[in-house]
Amino acid sequence: DVYTRQTLDKALDVYAKIAKEVNASVADIIVLAGNVAIEKASGVEVPFLAGRGDATEEQTDAESFRVLEPLADGFRNYQKTEYSVSPEEMLVDKSQLLGLTAHEMTVLVGGMRSLGITKDNLGNFSEENNKLDNDFFKKLLDMNVAWRPSGNNAYEGIDKVSGEVIRTASRVDLVFGSNSQLRSLAEVYASDDANDKFVNDFI
């Protein structure tokens, strides 16, 4: 559910072809592709260290991986279904499993949103998604916008002057404005002179 099978198969076919041409592992090519995408979006060099290996089909128990499928991934605004635990709590739980600090979690979510990596376009506040910048935080903390629920884990941002819906977000997105600790981090990145810091922290 996190990725559509069609999209995933298409991408993996391309990665496998490149890996064969340059005698590298598919795992290395996937990481390198991510690095190149971030470099193009930020204009900053991203370090790369090769050496990952690929497991063969014989070495992999495909059935055992089903229990590893994510129930929720707040970094991508994905949630498989409704749970008794809130989406933002599940984001914090995943962050702790990854060993991320609140600061690292904040900058990672902001970067993913600025690049348009989100389900159902929630939290995608940027007009162009090919640039890594602090636009998510600037627009999230815009005092001219009022938020109202529009569905399960979905909110509409209403322009206080025109009354028009100008953006949409999830509970995960809005927690960076409502939680005091996360808001303090978001305010740092939302500053006009904080874009370079944001990009460097993300990388």
Please provide the spans of the model-predicted regions.
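Long, well-ordered alpha/beta core segments of mature domains
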Residues: D1-I203
